[in-house]
Curated annotation (Swiss-Prot):
HAMAP family (UniProt xref): RNApol_bact_RpoC (MF_01322)
Name of protein: DNA-directed RNA polymerase subunit beta'
Keyword Nucleotidyltransferase: yes
EC numbers for this chain: 2.7.7.6
Family annotation (InterPro entries): DNA-dir_RpoC_beta_prime (IPR045867), DNA-dir_RpoC_beta_prime_bact (IPR012754), RNA_pol_asu (IPR000722), RNA_pol_N (IPR006592), RNA_pol_Rpb1_1 (IPR007080), RNA_pol_Rpb1_3 (IPR007066), RNA_pol_Rpb1_3_sf (IPR042102), RNA_pol_Rpb1_4 (IPR007083)
UniProt xrefs under CDD domains: RNAP_beta'_C, RNAP_beta'_N
One Gene Ontology term, aspect cellular component: DNA-directed RNA polymerase complex
Keyword DNA-binding set for record: no
Name of the coding gene: rpoC
Phylogenetic placement of the source organism: Bacteria, Pseudomonadati, Pseudomonadota, Betaproteobacteria, Neisseriales
GO biological process, one term: DNA-templated transcription
Membership in a protein family: Belongs to the RNA polymerase beta' chain family.
Length: 1396
């Protein structure tokens, strides 16, 4: 028996390994893998179905076809194991060796490996320093290459055509050697002296100054040094021996009717073998050179096709004209080995079915159909049946189950008890898309799902399906129960707020029962406790919304932390009193003593979670759900056409709007406004009118007149069904009601521009044919967008996951005191995100000091919880420096302190949490949701009416920011003449309360130091044009304003009036006029040019492209007057269509087109001599060095002569380039920019995401650095390397008193960052598999399997979560350490060598 068991042990060979290394295999290595040479192209004998000898399926080379049986049948059975049959030469062993044994083909002529040739940049070209074109000409026998010039004047590696070669042969005879084909290239590679070459290149690097040359040399040096370091020889890039894949991996399957289905690889191999054999024969026959050459070329081509079909020339096709699938195709792409089989596997023990509502379930339960449970838990049931003695064998047990005898159901109940199952709904966009539940057996065939978890799964019951998986092992069950059970996932990992929040009917029911009503039945009654209230309600003495007084028992904690009852009297309503029964201990009644809307309920659950803990919260949420359902049923809230009340003032408002539009049309006819302005103003009027009607409608809907107890008429909140649905947040929104009962409003065209004719009707009145037709535009765009954007969003998530997948919390504290300073986020002066929300759940980096007393209130390294945040709030602290993922010093991971609170658990994050993936999911998940949001409003244009003034929101003192500059015009108004001016309002304590940007050309309504009340107008402006304003008075003198050259006279057909418009230089005729810049000089009374204050340069004001000039030559102008105006483009509707690509653009770190410019240094601005299309701006720093910037003339310069700018300040208008921010302002400014921009997109959609997640991704975008000076290290200048590697190397250098490397930060887009990761397995499974593997092989890269993805691919536990412990213990055993020492991610000892 023991021998029999040993037998099985032999078969499974497991290799323990800690790293995987990839390299180029030498010919000897390939021969050592091989079990024999494949000499014939035959596969299987079509009569006997036995593999042909020496063919592609040969049993002698690859192993027996049947287990323990040789081919001729002489040896059968186990006892002959390991014998080699003398007749057929087959070893008697398991047939599965046919999956592992390789063969080889000895090539008659060397061939180049196409990956090293054609995968850009060509590695062969790099090593030989020849162009790809030249190498190809040699390889494919179009040219000779000189491999040994001898005494002749020819160059080494010189190419010769056929004629050249013959000439030279006549001339020099045998003096020189020239060859062609792969032999030639191989010869060149052999002659390459790596050491000397590297030495030469290093010398050249030091002497050369040209940037392009440095780059080129560095690249070549990198490749050569890789060869030198790894001990691989460059000539191995040329194949002499071709390995043959084991036959079971390229099977040949007989179909019925005597035909065979075969893998394409067999065809490709057959061609190689055929051509190879033919070439051997030709060489033996000493065939003419040209024939041999042709055959060699064909051999090279067939090997190319085998390795990577279609990379060079046309792809080889099979019988049915489709390209054959080569080895490279097998591993790359979505259907390749990596993504199809290694990263995504299918699992057993699963079922799927439609889901329905389970309103009676508890939060941790799901309803599982009996039939399904029986199938899923079969093995457990079999076991139980045997144990109980009801069945003696598995077969018998199976029979019992099939007959469904009553005992089986009892056993099923028992087996299922406390055995959680996993439910999953595709698409699984974040980790809450898979949760564990305890199954409850139900009749029917649909799975029942608890309504409160629908939000997490994004599920609804309109036919969604879900999959069930059964965790089998004890560990799996334990993990499912502790980590994945629905009750343990109350908070969303994206923002730390509850995700089990009641919605729809539940909200409606709770809202209905907590509303109050004037003069309800039994108003003013007083009750002793809630039981009395219940009785009164049941006996119909009071209504649900009646206002009453009731005495309630509340629980408050005393000093010992014990709950003590406290009796209080409350003025409340019947419904609220009844609801108070389900409040958990320690939650005050005032939290529900109001009309509960969706937001309030969410807050309620949040407060409950923080105060009462997870257990009570879950029970409370369940109770809320039952109550909500019950009372929404009692409420009987329905919808009826009469509920949609059309406002009385509608026709009046429409009349006014039409009148205004007519006026504007009139102005347009008189030429007072341009076409664009007219359009903008009309759209604006209709936008405003729509809002007014909506407001009037909401006012009428939301109030109703009733009589109170005294018989007086009072307003009370309406009980209109539609209003209640929208107000409670159960269904619908103001925007939707506006379309039902107000007016539909403006519609957008598919390109986003707004149609200026609004739809004045609403759905209740019905639309005319034209209105209906206009609407179809927007509605259809919504549907088309959805389809396209779902894919984009999924791709964004995939890239995010890939860039962050190896980021795991691996230690408690990295000990840094770096961090970012957090302030409240202001936009347009409003606080959109308070400081408290930004620092909640973060760890302080430095002590927090009370500004009034100067004492430390919170020490550094403290996790900010709700109490501490309140403290910061109450002390009026404006900014707090907190730790962040970006500045964490942990290498190959992150520390818990820099990350802070685990949002989904509400406490400090645990080691092993895969925060990278969580961040990626949190950012990617809403992307998909948002993409599907467009069509809910049915394409109605939602756009804010253009802002034309700015108001102060608080009382205080006005202060102008340091950049603010203004002039007083002739009317005494203050006109702003800077683009970066801000009005700041300070409160009595001198703290900044708000900051308002004021645009160029605005009229200020306040002065510096003025006291204002909230709501005061600070400045006004025309929103539809940008003015060009003069700061000086004088007489206008035009220069270069030449009609037909630089400006065009535009006559309006309607009005017959003409204006001058500046023409775009690109559109101007003649090269002279392209150079000219139309501008204005000002003359004083004596006719001299007015000079700039404090300098002798004269004032010149340039007109930008598209400016409409409003002054005439020779006209007198005063300060602050408008010389020209530039019409603003009509605004488009903003929705996430702009949003999703915007997020992708930020994370890809793309430079925006026509980006603005930032000042490179701090200094003084001056203008130099202009060139053809550019103006020259010079910044002179304090040392007197000038830095020149050439700026295209159509760009808008934000600075003026003599202005002092700081490094990193904006000098040319336009979107900023994140790379510039990093270079000039540093990491913190860059992080702030990306976080703010990304957040803005999500905020627009009302999605909350914690900044942490974005920071985690920015950390990954910054993980590479560029070496600026290599010091004594092995790095090459200009090389990109992992930050962690540089830091480690520098530590080593410092320890040995050597010169460390200098580096600068570099920002990589997420795709680039994923591909440039150290792990080649991870990169190859992401994108561009061929390129990644080629590079890795040349570099002889070694993958230490640090990330999650690499470990999934090699099939072991991931180093995160519970898998982290497994990896830690494995490392310890390998290094023989005590259990005490934690060696987390140290270099692994033995690497698995695959190709030395």
């Amino acid at each position: 028996m023991k021998a029999l068991l040993d037998l099985f042990k032999q078969v499974t060979q497991e290799e323990e390994f800690d790293a995987i290394k990839i390299g180029i295999a030498s010919p000897d290595k390939i021969r050592s893998w091989s079990y024999g040479e494949v000499k014939k192209p035959e596969t299987i004998n079509y009569r006997t179905f036995k593999p042909e000898r020496d063919g592609l399926f040969c049993a002698r080379i690859f192993g027996p076809v049947k287990d323990y049986e040789c081919l001729c049948g002489k040896y059968k059975r186990l006892k002959h194991r390991g014998v080699i049959c003398e007749k057929c030469g087959v070893e008697v062993t398991l047939s599965k060796v046919r999956r592992e044994r390789m063969g080889h083909i000895e090539l008659a002529s060397p061939t180049a490996h196409i990956w090293f040739l054609k995968s850009l940049p060509s590695r062969l070209g790099m090593v030989l320093d020849m162009t790809l074109r030249d190498i190809e000409r040699v390889l494919y026998f179009e040219a000779y290459v000189v491999t040994d010039p001898g005494m002749t004047p020819m160059q080494y590696r010189q190419l010769l055509t056929e004629e050249d070669f013959l000439d030279k042969e006549d001339q020099y005879g045998e003096e020189f050697v020239a060859m062609m084909g792969a032999e030639a290239v191989k010869e060149l590679l052999k002659k390459l002296d790596l050491d000397a070459e590297i030495e030469g290149l290093r010398r050249e690097l030091e002497t050369t100054n040209s940037d392009t040359k440095i780059k080129k040399i560095a690249k070549r040096l990198k490749v050569l040094e890789a060869f030198q370091r790894s001990g691989m020889k460059p000539e191995w890039m040329i194949l002499e021996v071709l390995p043959v894949l084991p036959p079971e991996l390229r099977p040949l399957v007989p179909l019925d009717g005597g035909r065979f289905a075969t893998s394409d690889l067999n065809d490709l191999y057959r061609r190689v073998i055929n051509r190879n054999n033919r070439l051997k024969r030709l060489l033996e026959l000493r065939a003419p050179d040209i024939i041999v050459r042709n055959e060699k070329r064909m051999l090279q081509e067939s090997v190319d096709s085998l390795l990577d079909n279609g990379r060079r020339g046309k792809a080889m096709t099979g019988a049915n004209k489709r390209p054959l699938k080569s080895l490279a195709d097998m591993i790359k792409g979505k259907g390749g080995r990596f993504r199809q089989n290694l990263l995504g596997k299918r699992v057993d023990y699963s079922g799927r079915s439609v889901i329905t509502v389970g309103p009676t379930l508890r939060l941790h339960q799901c309803g599982l159909p009996k039939k399904m449970a029986l199938e899923l838990f079969k093995p457990f049931i079999f076991h139980k049946l045997e144990v109980m003695g009801l069945a003696s064998t598995i077969k018998a047990a199976k029979k019992l189950v099939e007959q469904e005898v009553p005992e089986v159901w009892d056993i099923l109940e028992e087996v299922i008890r406390e055995h959680p199952v996993l439910l999953n709904r595709a698409p699984t966009l974040h980790r809450l898309g898979i949760q564990a539940f305890e199954p409850v057996l139900i009749e029917g065939k649909a799975i029942q799902l608890h309504p409160l978890v629908c939000a997490a799964f994004n599920a609804d019951f309109d036919g969604d399906q879900m999959a069930v998986h059964v965790p089998l092992s004890l560990e799996a069950q334990m993990e499912a129960r502790t980590l994945m059970l629905a009750t343990n996932n109350v908070l969303s990992p994206a923002n730390g707020e509850p995700i089990i929040v009641p919605s729809q009917d539940i909200v409606l029911g709770l809202y209905y029962m907590t509303r109050d009503k004037v003069n309800g039945k039994g108003e003013g009654m007083v009750f002793a406790d809630t039981k009395e209230v219940h009785r009164a309600y049941e006996t119909r003495q009071v209504e649900l919304a009646t206002r009453i007084t009731v005495r309630l028992k509340e629980w408050e904690k005393d000093e010992q932390g014990e709950f003590q009852p406290v009796i209080k009297r409350y003025n409340t309503t019947v419904g609220r009193a009844i609801l108070s029964d389900i409040l958990p201990k320690g939650l005050p009644f005032e939290h529900i003593n109001k009309a509960l809307k969706k937001k309030e309920i969410s807050k309620l659950i949040n407060v409950s979670f923080r105060r009462c803990g997870i257990r009570d919260t879950v029970i409370f949420a369940d109770q809320l759900m039952y109550t909500g359902f019950a009372y929404s049923t009692r409420g009987g809230i329905s919808i009826c056409v009469d509920d949609m009340q059309i406002p009385v003032k509608k026709s009046e408002l429409l009349g006014e709007a039409n009148k205004e539009v007519k006026e504007i049309e009139e102005q347009y006819r008189q030429g007072l406004v341009t076409q664009g302005e007219r359009y903008n103003k009309v759209v604006d009027i209709w936008g405003r009118t729509g809002d007014k009607i909506a407001k009037a409608m909401m006012d009428e809907l939301s109030k109703q007149k009733v009589l109170d107890r005294e018989g007086k008429e009072v307003d009370q909140e309406s009980f209109n069904s539609i209003y209640m649905m929208a107000d409670s947040g159960a269904r619908g929104s103001a925007a939707q009601i506006k379309q039902l009962a107000g007016m539909r409003g403006l519609m957008a065209k598919p390109d986003g521009s707004i149609i200026e004719t609004p739809i004045t009707a609403n759905f209740r009145e019905g639309l005319t044919v034209l209105q209906y037709f206009i609407s179809t535009h927007g509605a259809r765009k919504g549907l088309a967008d959805t389809a396209l954007k779902t894919a984009n969003s999924g791709y964004l998530t995939r890239r995010l996951v890939d860039v962050t997948q190896d980021l795991v919390v691996i230690e408690d504290d990295c000990g840094t005191s770096n961090g970012f300073t957090m302030k409240a986020v202001l936009q347009g002066g409003d606080v959109i995100e308070a400081l408290r929300d930004r620092i909640l759940g973060r760890v302080t980096a430095v002590d927090v000091v009370d500004p009034s007393t100067g004492e430390t209130v919170i020490e550094a390294g403290t996790l900010m919880d709700e109490h501490l945040v309140d403290l910061v709030d109450s002390l009026g602290i404006d900014e707090v420096k907190v730790r962040t993922a970006i500045t964490c010093d942990t290498r190959y991971g992150l520390c818990a302190k820099c990350y802070g609170r685990d949002l989904a658990r509400g406490k400090q994050v645990n080691a092993g949490e895969a925060i990278g993936v969580i961040a990626a999911q949190s950012i990617g998940e809403p992307g998909t949701q948002l993409t599907m949001r467009t069509f809910h409003i049915g394409g109605a244009a939602s756009r804010n009416a253009a802002a034309s003034q700015v108001e102060g929101k608080s009382n205080g003192t006005v202060r102008f920011s340091s950049q603010m500059r203004y002039v007083a015009n002739t009317k005494g108004e203050l006109i702003v003449i800077t683009r970066s001016g801000e009005v700041v309002i300070h409160d009595d304590m001198g703290r900044e309360r708000e900051r308002r940007k004021v645009p160029y050309g605005a009229t200020l309504m306040v002065t510096d130091g003025l006291q204002i009340k909230a709501g005061a107008v600070l400045a006004t402006w025309d929103p539809h044009t940008r003015p060009i304003i003069t700061e000086y008075a004088g007489r206008v003198k035009f220069e270069n304003v030449e009609e037909g050259n630089t400006v065009a006279k535009q006559t309006d057909e309607v009005t017959g009036l003409s204006t001058l418009v500046v023409i775009d230089p690109k559109r101007r005729a003649g090269s002279q006029s392209k150079m000219l810049r139309p501008l204005v000089k000002l003359l004083d009374d004596n006719g001299n040019e007015v000079k700039l204050a404090g300098s002798d340069a004269s004032v010149s004001i340039t007109f930008q492209v598209g400016a409409i000039i409003t002054v005439r030559d020779g006209q007198d102008v005063g300060k602050g007057e408008v010389l020209a105006r530039i019409p603003q483009e009509s605004s488009k509707t903003r929705d996430i269509t702009g949003g999703l690509p915007r997020v992708a653009e930020l994370f890809e770190a793309r430079s925006p087109k026509d980006a603005g410019m930032l000042a490179e240094v701090t200094g003084t601005v001056s203008f130099g001599k202009d060139t053809k299309g550019k103006q020259r701006l010079i910044i002179t720093d304090l040392e007197g060095n000038g830095y020149e910037n050439l700026i295209p003339k159509d760009k808008h310069v934000l600075v003026h002569d003599g202005q002092v700018v700081n490094r990193g300040e904006s000098i040319v208008d336009g979107p900023v380039d994140p790379h510039d921010i990093l270079r000039l302002q540093g990491i913190e400014a860059l992080a702030r920019y990306i976080v703010q921009e990304v957040q803005e997109v999500y905020r627009l959609q009302g999605v909350k995401i914690n900044d942490k997640h974005i920071e985690v991704i920015i950390r990954q975008m910054l993980r590479r650095v560029i070496i600026t000076d290599s010091g004594d290290t092995e790095f090459i200048q200009g090389e990109q390397v992992e930050r962690a590697d540089v830091l480690e190397m520098n530590d080593k250098m410092m320890a040995e008193n050597k010169e460390p490397a200098q580096y600068e930060n570099v920002l990589l887009g997420i795709t680039k960052a994923s591909l440039s990761t150290d792990s080649f397995i991870s990169a190859a499974s992401f994108q561009e598999t061929t390129r990644v593997l080629t590079e890795a092989a040349i570099m002889g890269k070694r993958d230490d399997l640090r990330g999650l993805k690499e470990n999934v691919i090699v099939g072991r536990l991931i180093p995160a979560g519970t898998g982290l412990a497994y990896h830690r213990t494995r490392r310890r055993q390998n290094l023989g350490l005590d259990a005490g020492e934690s060696m987390l991610f140290d270099p692994a000892p033995a690497a698995l060598e695959s190709g030395e």
